C-alpha cells in the first residue's frame, strides 16, 4: 500500500488538535479551542466538557480524508500516523463516554469487575481504522482510566474556587504526569514507581484527594472475561498511622505470621499485602511514624519489598504509595524526627490541599 501524506492544512489542524488533546482537561481554555475552530466558543455549562465542541469538526476532517480514499490509518506513517491516531482515539473515547459512566456506576454498586458489554464495539471501532488488537485493548484500558480519573477528580472534590481548580489540575498531572504523551508512550504501566506526598491542614480533604488518585490507576482489560482485571472499588486502601500503638503498627502495615508474637494465633495480612497491583495505599498521618517504622517503609518505597512480622521471606509490593500529613515535615526533619531519605523518596510529587 502506497504511503499517504497529510496536506499542509490537515497537518496544521491535527497538530493543533493534538496540542489541545494532550492538555490537562482542568486547564483547557476556550481561547485555545476557539483558535482551532476559527470561531468564538460559547461555553455551554450543561456540556460534559469543552472538548466536546471539537467533535463535529474532527469528524468532518476525517470525512474529508475518507472522501479522498483514506478511511483508515494504514496508509499513513510516522508523525502523520501519530497525529491521526490521537484524533481517532479522541472520537472513539467520546463516543463511549456514556457507557463508561454507566460502568463506573455499576462497579460502585457491585464492588467487583463488571462485564464490559460495549468492549467489542470499542475494539471494533479501533481495529477497523487500523489499530492492532493489542493496541486497541491497551487503549480500552486507557479510556477506562481517563474516564475514572475525570469522574473522581471532578466530582470527588467539592468547590470551584481557583485553588480547588488548581488542586484538580495537580491531581490530573499526578495520574497522567505533566506530559501525557510521555505517559502514553512509556509510563502508563509504571506509575507505581512514583510516590506522592499530600500536605494540608486537618479536615481539608487530603483523603479525598488521595482517593481520586488511588481509584484512577491503569487497570488492564481482560479480553477472555470481557472485564477489567480488577475493580477500582478495591484499588484504594488507607491506613491512619496515628491510630495504632507502636507495638501494633508493623503488623498492620506488613502483616504477621502465626506465632510471631503472643496473641498471633493466625496469619494476618497487612495493608501492603492487601493492596492490589493496580491500586494505591494511603499512609495517612505519615508524620506520626517513628524512625524505626520510617526505615522499614523506606525499604518498601525504595526496593518494593516488605517482610511480614515473624517471616524471613520478603514479599513484593506492586502498588503505589501515597502519604499524607498535616504536620510540617521540614520542621520534623530539622528536629531529626523525620528521615531525609524517606522524605525524598515520598516526594516524587508533592500536592498541597488548600484550606477551606
Give the positions of each predicted feature.
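N-terminal accessory segments that target, anchor, or regulate ATP-driven/P-loop NTPase machines
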Residues: 1-159
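Long, hydrophobic, amphipathic alpha-helical segments used as structural scaffolds
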Residues: 100, 104-111, 182, 186, ...
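Solvent-exposed amphipathic alpha-helical surface segments
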Residues: 103, 178, 182, 216, ...
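Short, flexible helix-adjacent loops and helix caps
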Residues: 108, 131, 180-187, 222, ...
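Short, mixed-charge, low-aromatic patches
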Residues: 121-133, 143, 166-168, 302-303, ...
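Pre-Walker A (pre-P-loop) alpha-helix and adjacent loop at the N terminus of AAA/AAA+ ATPase modules
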Residues: 153-194
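Conserved catalytic/coupling elements of P-loop NTPase cores
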Residues: 194-356
Amino acid at each position: 500500500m502506497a504511503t499517504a501524506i497529510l496536506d499542509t492544512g490537515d497537518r496544521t489542524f491535527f497538530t493543533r488538535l493534538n496540542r489541545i488533546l494532550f492538555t490537562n482537561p482542568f486547564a483547557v481554555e476556550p481561547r485555545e479551542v476557539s483558535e482551532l475552530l476559527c470561531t468564538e466558543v460559547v461555553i455551554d455549562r450543561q456540556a460534559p466538557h469543552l472538548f466536546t465542541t471539537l467533535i463535529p469538526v474532527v469528524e468532518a476532517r476525517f470525512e474529508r480524508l475518507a472522501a479522498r480514499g483514506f478511511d483508515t490509518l494504514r496508509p499513513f506513517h510516522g508523525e502523520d500516523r501519530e497525529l491521526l491516531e490521537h484524533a481517532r482515539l479522541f472520537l472513539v473515547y467520546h463516543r463511549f463516554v456514556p457507557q463508561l459512566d454507566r460502568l463506573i456506576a455499576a462497579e460502585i454498586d457491585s464492588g467487583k469487575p463488571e462485564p464490559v458489554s460495549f468492549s467489542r464495539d470499542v475494539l471494533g471501532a479501533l481495529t477497523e481504522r487500523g489499530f492492532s488488537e493489542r493496541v486497541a485493548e491497551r487503549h480500552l484500558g486507557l479510556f477506562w482510566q481517563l474516564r475514572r480519573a475525570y469522574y473522581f477528580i471532578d466530582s470527588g472534590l467539592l468547590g470551584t474556587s481557583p485553588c480547588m481548580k488548581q488542586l484538580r489540575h495537580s491531581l490530573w498531572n499526578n495520574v497522567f504526569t505533566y506530559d501525557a504523551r510521555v505517559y502514553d508512550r512509556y509510563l502508563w504501566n509504571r506509575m507505581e514507581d512514583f510516590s506522592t506526598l499530600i500536605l494540608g491542614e486537618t479536615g481539608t480533604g487530603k483523603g479525598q484527594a488521595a482517593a481520586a488518585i488511588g481509584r484512577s490507576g491503569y487497570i488492564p482489560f481482560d479480553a477472555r472475561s470481557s472485564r477489567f482485571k480488577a475493580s477500582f472499588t478495591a484499588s484504594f486502601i488507607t491506613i491512619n498511622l496515628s491510630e495504632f500503638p507502636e507495638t501494633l503498627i508493623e503488623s498492620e502495615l506488613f502483616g504477621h505470621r502465626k506465632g510471631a508474637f503472643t496473641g498471633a494465633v493466625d496469619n494476618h495480612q497487612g495493608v501492603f499485602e492487601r493492596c492490589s497491583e493496580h491500586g494505591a495505599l494511603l499512609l495517612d498521618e505519615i508524620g506520626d511514624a517513628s524512625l524505626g517504622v520510617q526505615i522499614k517503609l523506606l525499604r518498601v518505597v525504595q526496593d518494593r519489598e516488605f517482610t511480614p512480622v515473624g517471616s524471613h521471606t520478603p514479599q513484593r509490593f506492586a502498588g503505589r504509595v501515597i502519604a499524607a500529613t498535616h504536620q510540617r515535615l521540614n520542621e520534623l526533619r530539622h528536629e531529626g524526627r523525620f528521615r531525609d531519605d524517606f522524605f525524598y523518596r515520598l516526594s516524587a510529587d508533592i500536592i498541597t490541599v488548600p484550606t477551606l
